[in-house]
Amino acid sequence: MKFTKMHGCGNDYVYVNCLEEKINNPNKVAKFISDRHFGIGSDGMICICPSDKADFRMAMYNSDGSEGAMCGNGVRCIAKYVYDYGLTDKTTITIETKGGIKELDLTVEDGKVTWVKVDMEAPITKASQIPAIYDDLDEVIHQPVIVDGKEYNITCISMGNPHGVVFVDSVADIDIEKIGPKFENHPMFPDRVNTEFIELVDDKTIKMRVWERGAGETLACGTGACASAYASYLNKKTGKKVLVHLLGGDLQIEYDEEKDTIFMTGPATTVFDGEIDLTGIDD
């Protein structure tokens, strides 16, 4: 199977052109190739597929083999892939995801995509649509939750996938390997949750660490950055335009109140192309 390793702010996936390649068991293949010791090594696998609703369709799989709904960094890399590898010559494209159809504007330099702006659509705060269960509340904004014996305040948002945003004094002091799984599997989240730990730098800047469901800590999460920026705005900690410092780089997030949509702008990088023998894995 031919593949391309790509990343957005260090959030790395193995990309497969499924307009040409066929994968019989994507869950098993994703788990195998994501292993950083025995596989290629990545946060998961993303398949670029045909779509009857958009220019292309994204099918994403986490490193544990589970299927994901949406990945902001991943969708930017798809945009770079399809342009750089000649699958399209358009600089505005649409990509179908399980979290909705996304529109992307491509910045091209010397024939290659360098930056991508994504319309991530409207953030969802209705608890039943995230889903998040919290008493009889219709929205969960800055509400206390006990995790591993400690009280945190959490804001729940969906960007096509569920997020719980928690503000902390210092992201460096979070024992994310210990607390991340406790949030991910908390009973208030029936479909598990991605958890963002946020440190406020100023009213235009935040630092973020993320524990992704099915993947653990990653260097970046685009939908998480969007959820975190919007949560910062809802909690009156920042304005509508926020620079998010992630472990793997920076993303610019802007909430357009008039359109009720979030725009994410960030880089997309190709690491290398390769081919892997999946005999015994995808038979």
Which residues does each predicted region cover?
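A glycine-rich beta-to-alpha transition motif near the start of alpha/beta enzyme domains, typified by
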Residues: 1-112, 164-283
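Membrane helix-loop-helix hairpins that form the core translocation module of multi-pass transporters
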Residues: 115-123
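Active-site/binding-pocket entry motifs
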Residues: 123-124, 270
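Active-site glycine-rich loop that binds ribose-phosphate moieties when present
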Residues: 124-153
